[in-house]
Every structure is written in C-alpha cells, then in structure tokens.
Regions:
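Catalytic P-loop NTPase motifs of RecA-like helicase/translocase cores
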Residues: 4-6, 47, 128-129
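Asp-based, Mg2+/Mn2+-dependent phosphohydrolase catalytic module
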Residues: 54-76, 85-121, 125-155
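Active-site neighborhood of HAD-like aspartate-dependent phosphohydrolases
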Residues: 1-38
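Acidic active-site catalytic centers that drive phospho-/nucleotidyl reactions
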Residues: 1, 42, 124, 128
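Short glycine-enriched, charge-decorated loop/helix-capping segments at active-site entrances
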Residues: 9-18, 51-54, 91-95
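Substrate-recognition element of Asp-dependent hydrolases with the DxDx(T/V) motif
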Residues: 23, 27-63, 72-83, 132
C-alpha cells in the first residue's frame, strides 16, 4: 500500500483498489529492463481480524492479472499476516517476516535465487527501506505521486 496501490486503510476489497499514478507503467518499465517483479507487503489486517488470508490472496490474484495484462508480470506476492498485538491468536505473533524485519525479502532471495546486490526495493515507509537494507538490498523511499517518474531515477 502506498507504492503500487493507493493507501486506503486495510485494503482487501477489489472494489477499493486504486493504482498509484504510473504504477503499472513503472513495473512494466522495470520488467522491460530485465528486473523480476516481487511484492512484499505487511497485511496486519489479517491479525487484527479485519479480513482473512483468502481475501489477501483474492486481491493479489486480481492485481497480478491486471499487472500481467499491462506487461508487468509479478513473480510472487509475499505478505505477512502477523502483528504482535493482533486480535486473532493464530497471527498475534512477533514474527520474522513483518517489515522492518527482512524475512519476506530473504525468502524471496532464497526462493528465486535473487542477487541482492543487483536488486532494489521501493517502499513508502522507513521500515520498508530498513527491511531491504537488512537483506542486503538497496532500499528507496517513495514519497511522490508518480511511480514511473520515480523509478526512472533509479533504472
């Protein structure tokens, strides 16, 4: 939330999805330059009982389809459903995957044999950048309004 889709509190409904300006184009641009596209996202709404993991998966499937149609195939969506103060006991844990910890990024590196030194992560909060750097990946903080303009300063 906040990088490829607009940050609406606890997004899980497809009807609430709004793409950040230039997001689809930015991802297609990165893909055209040889980058694999992987998403890592905290989804504490699951731990808080606002929605279920299946809702996250449905939304991610929809996003993946739209992005694929835009020339930006997502290799994998990693998400963390945990929050140590969650109300759903199963997910109310202090895990290794919730950013700013690097667990999801490390898992992606392992699963897809990613070279951290030739990779980068764009996030909308310092915890995203911290997670990237803890995994040996360059992190960039996106605070603008157009992701394509931003990514062209990186690639």
């Amino acid at each position: 939330d906040g990088v490829i889709n607009k940050d609406v509190s606890y997004l899980y409904k497809i009807s609430d999805l709004e793409w950040v300006d230039g997001a689809k184009e930015a991802l297609a641009y990165a893909y055209s330059k040889g980058y694999d596209l992987i998403v890592v996202t905290n989804q504490s709404g699951v731990a808080r009982g606002y929605y279920k993991e299946s809702d996250v998966q449905i939304l991610h499937d929809h996003m993946a389809h739209e992005l694929d149609c835009s020339g930006a195939p997502i290799l994998h969506f990693y998400y963390c459903p945990h929050h140590k103060e969650g109300s759903v006991q199963l997910y109310a844990v202090d895990c290794e995957c919730r950013k700013p910890k690097p667990g999801m990024i490390n898992q992606a590196i392992k699963d897809y044999d990613v070279d951290p030194k030739s990779s980068f992560l764009i996030g909308d909060s310092q915890r995203d950048v911290d997670a990237a750097e803890a995994a040996g990946v360059k992190g960039y903080l996106f605070t603008g309004t157009n992701l394509l303009d931003f990514i062209k300063t990186i690639i």
